[in-house]
Amino acid sequence: RGITHGILALFLVPLIIAVIAGFRKGFFYYYFLSFLAYGIHIFMDLTNQYGTRVLSPFDWNAYSLDISFIIDPYISIGLFLCVVLGRFNRKRAALIAAITFILFFSYFGGRYYLRNATKDFLKEKLEANTYKMCPLPNDFLRWWFIAKSGDEIKVGFADLFTKRICIQDTFTFNDKDPLIERSKETKFVKNFLYFAKYPYPEIRKEGSRTIVMWRELAYSFMPGEHFTAKVTFDENNKPIKSEFKF
């Protein structure tokens, strides 16, 4: 989701496709279809909290709308039905596709509204400087939140239906430890920090070894170790192992 999902690629990739396939029905026909398809693809990536460098190469910050999870069954089923119905009724394939995308954008609009409503509710219940709302799998009224005040970070669930919030963890951010700084030099942590929008490092001891664990708080509601980078140091504080988990 780097330069291939940026504004430059949005114009360049359809151009390449149109040049290759343009001899069949014309350059502009394929360019328009490719531009539309690639633009919708980038937009759908932009809807989840993973982050997309949509303005690259002019701006390398990752942006996200935070309104849908990485895999949304409603989107997948909708696309599948659109393809199947279009294959069986080719005369109305364009109409079926148009209705599908109208429903999709209505769906995204509804989720955008619910996210903002939940965020406003959270602000009434929890005092913080910044608030981040993250979508949960197959859920509309319950959202994962990250609330930050200075060096203190609180994460948990905000439920718009029951009008309740549940704080799961409270962290104190501190990345000044020498081992944390050294862990940033490893390949896996560099890759992790490239996409992580809310990274949080923690240190723990296991015998004579020290482990630096980086977590992406936007996905920390998932059980187990997901979206983490881990570096193990020996008793002499030398890195002996590093790993990355999705």
Model-derived features: positions:
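N-terminal membrane-targeting hydrophobic helices
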Residues: 1-126, 131-135
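Extracytosolic and intramembrane catalytic regions of membrane-associated proteins
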Residues: 129-130, 137-144, 148-246
